A protein has these predicted regions:
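Terminal leader/tail segments of proteins
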Residues: 1-146
Length: 146
């Protein structure tokens, strides 16, 4: 049996939302199962039309509502020598790509996951990074406003 385009579109309405703090919700309840949360982060992608999806492959995906249109949050940061190490909402860690750090108004953002995604930098993480800001620069890079 082949599904119509309308039936497929209806099935893609997942009811899953990613909030501004990096928490997944389904039909009003927070997703708390560690394994399921990890899978949802692995499947996170963006369609060419700009809509957020949870993708298994080119044909199998569902729509994802993302609050604020930025999926990742930098929850904390620490310094290892001259490198800032970020802890993201998916519990992964990666070095800050300093050249991607920018401000939108007063809110700091950077690129994560090899530059694939924007991430909002939390207040806690920003305070750690700000310890090394000198004359509007972090590690020699000017922090632009966009």
């Amino acid at each position: 049996m082949k599904l119509s385009d309308a039936e497929i579109e209806k099935l893609r309405q997942s009811g899953i939302r990613l909030d501004g703090e990096g928490r997944f919700w389904h039909e009003g309840a927070e997703v708390t199962h560690h394994g399921l949360r990890a899978a949802l982060w692995r499947w996170l992608d963006r369609n060419p039309d700009g809509r957020w999806v949870l993708r298994l492959d080119d044909q199998r995906f569902v729509w994802l509502d993302v609050d604020g249109d930025v999926p990742y949050v930098v929850r904390s940061a620490r310094w290892e020598g001259d490198r800032a190490i970020l802890r993201l909402a998916d519990d992964s860690e990666e070095p800050l790509a300093v050249e991607t750090l920018h401000l939108r108004g007063a809110q700091p953002f950077c690129r994560v996951k090899q530059g694939r995604f924007d991430a909002r930098v939390s207040t806690l993480a920003w305070h750690t990074l700000a310890e090394r800001i000198d004359d509007g620069k972090l590690c020699g890079f000017v922090i632009p406003t966009r």
